[in-house]
């Protein structure tokens, strides 16, 4: 008596497993009569037999995702290590010598400095850059090729402040 409930339980468990597992029911004609067969969930019906798809690994999207992430990580790490171990050579640039002449100290407020006047300060024409730090930054040394070229002075309106807004509006 005890064996019978165990057999019934095993039979029910087997039926439950068979029903829950997704299977494909296939059939084909042999002569005039159909012949039935069952394939597993990952198999397809192929004529008179079951066959496995060659590209069934495409269903494993997480496998391909992890594989591509691993390849990208390895390539990035290899590139980083290669750049650290073998840094690119520095480009050799030609030597660029910068030389400048120091201006003599300012002798006094009324004394004129020797050399051409500089027109960088809007305070007025003929102002020397000794007291003007902005003009000193853009000063051309006298022995450079640009210093020997004679340039005409800028127009007079460059050294005057702009007219007031009201005057410009009334003129139009």
Swiss-Prot record:
Quaternary structure and interacting proteins, as annotated: Interacts with WWOX (via WW domain).
Keyword Ligase: no
Top-level taxon of the source organism: Eukaryota
Described purpose of this protein according to its UniProt entry: Increases the transcriptional activity of NFKB1 by facilitating its nuclear translocation, DNA-binding and associated apoptotic response, when overexpressed. May sequester WWOX in lysosomal vesicles and thereby regulate WWOX role as tumor suppressor.
Protein keywords: Cytoplasmic vesicle, Endosome, Lysosome, Membrane, Signal, Transcription, Transcription regulation, Transmembrane, Transmembrane helix
Chain ranges on the Cytoplasmic side, renumbered to this chain: 82-172
Ranges that cross the membrane: 61-81
Signal peptide range: 1-22
Record's protein name: WW domain binding protein VOPP1
GO molecular function: enzyme binding
Subcellular location: Cytoplasmic vesicle membrane; Late endosome membrane; Lysosome membrane
Region (Disordered): 102-153
Tissues expressed in: Widely expressed with highest levels in thymus and ovary.
Protein family per UniProt: Belongs to the VOPP1/ECOP family.
Extracellular side: 23-60
Entry GO terms, CC: cytoplasmic vesicle membrane; endosome; late endosome; late endosome membrane; lysosomal membrane; lysosome; organelle membrane
UniProt membrane topology term: Single-pass type I membrane protein; Single-pass membrane protein
Pro residues biased stretches: 104-119
